[in-house]
Amino acid sequence: MEEGGGGVRSLVPGGPVLLVLCGLLEASGGGRALPQLSDDIPFRVNWPGTEFSLPTTGVLYKEDNYVIMTTAHKEKYKCILPLVTSGDEEEEKDYKGPNPRELLEPLFKQSSCSYRIESYWTYEVCHGKHIRQYHEEKETGQKINIHEYYLGNMLAKNLLFEKEREAEEKEKSNEIPTKNIEGQMTPYYPVGMGNGTPCSLKQNRPRSSTVMYICHPESKHEILSVAEVTTCEYEVVILTPLLCSHPKYRFRASPVNDIFCQSLPGSPFKPLTLRQLEQQEEILRVPFRRNKEEDLQSTKEERFPAIHKPIAIGSQPVLTVGTTHISKLTDDQLIKEFLSGSYCFHGGVGWWKYEFCYGKHVHQYHEDKDSGKTSVVVGTWNQEEHIEWAKKNTARAYHLQDDGTQTVRMVSHFYGNGDICDITDKPRQVTVKLKCKESDSPHAVTVYMLEPHSCQYILGVESPVICKILDTADENGLLSLPN
């Protein structure tokens, strides 16, 4: 590697282009190692050719701040690097204000609570006191039944102090914990809560949670997310403006920094191998063509939410929505294999994943590289049981079109005889709702699960594949190959 007189800043891969660059280029001469790579700062590589002028505004560049890179084909490039500096370092060093616990103290003293309403559960975080998830049901006579779990409270002082002591030690050593929030590594202050409702899946040990407070100047202490990261252990992310006065907890935008790689005499403006890779990507990027049916205005029917968040219910996650992609089989072959049960849909984000094999079973599972696969049979298919169920329930739901015709918008199937439930001592059972979902990706499928009652589930499956077979449903909602 050859250096300019001003030295070399860190060369950081901030995206696919830079990852490709690192694979294509190698430093030449000098015998020194490249700077250490990190993902903290994103970069973008530009290939301006032999002649160009450095930007005079924005990030600062110097002509002598460069590296000479050589490809496997002996193509040479002079890559000029931006002078990336952190203007917050001095402010952090000089900060003498309150620590994060002291900044959050007004919130804890106010006895205030924050709420997040999901499709079934409501989450209540009373700051400095407890975390509760609950569901209210009104019965005949307006009697209200409350189904609730405490995910943690402040009675478990040992857990609380352990979390806070760890956070204080990290702050002193400048190791503030961070969490990936929408692609941005964001600093947070953790508050531990233990002594929650006993968890039957963990030998009745109490549930526990970590509340992660992150800075957001315009927030009002909202609950951003609730996730069950492992069985009966939760993470709750809270947005608060109170931490924003502390420089170490402020949200920092990461602007993309441009690197300019000039081609040296005898070299093309861009490496040959990189151009070949880009051409291959263009070939693979086949545009999706919408058919006439998909060009029609979308109906106003109720649509299941498509939120990528694992949400806990009872001792298990109950609303987990995720999008997966089916291999590019031909549509006819894919439908045939789906209806035969040989092609299964998989989905879910978080601890639990779901497998649905049409006419066979619904499984809930978790895979761990150390302990292997944990699987729960949620329901198995029996056509006679389903037909009996269909006599008392709606197996085929219609949508009325503007021209007065009816089309099938959803079918529901009953799968019973699952594994015995610890709470009810009865077999688990699930109602599978198959619904058409228009998408720019014709092979996408969304799978999610609800648990409105203990061990009685609803599995939602939405896909463009289902659009092609819904109208074949008979009076019992059973599907067949289209003509």
Swiss-Prot record:
Signal peptide position in this chain?
1-33
Post-translational modification comment from the UniProt entry: N-glycosylated.
Instruction: Check the record and name the InterPro entries matching this protein.
Output: Man6P_isomerase_rcpt-bd_dom_sf (IPR009011), MRH_dom (IPR044865), OS-9-like (IPR045149), OS9-like_dom (IPR012913)
Q: Which key words tag this protein in UniProt?
A: Disulfide bond, Endoplasmic reticulum, Glycoprotein, Repeat, Signal
The protein's matches in PROSITE patterns, at most eight in alphabetical order, are given as: MRH
Primary role: Probable lectin that binds selectively to improperly folded lumenal proteins. May function in endoplasmic reticulum quality control and endoplasmic reticulum-associated degradation (ERAD) of both non-glycosylated proteins and glycoproteins.
Q: This protein is called what?
A: Endoplasmic reticulum lectin 1
- Name the source organism: Pongo abelii (Sumatran orangutan)
- List the gene name: ERLEC1
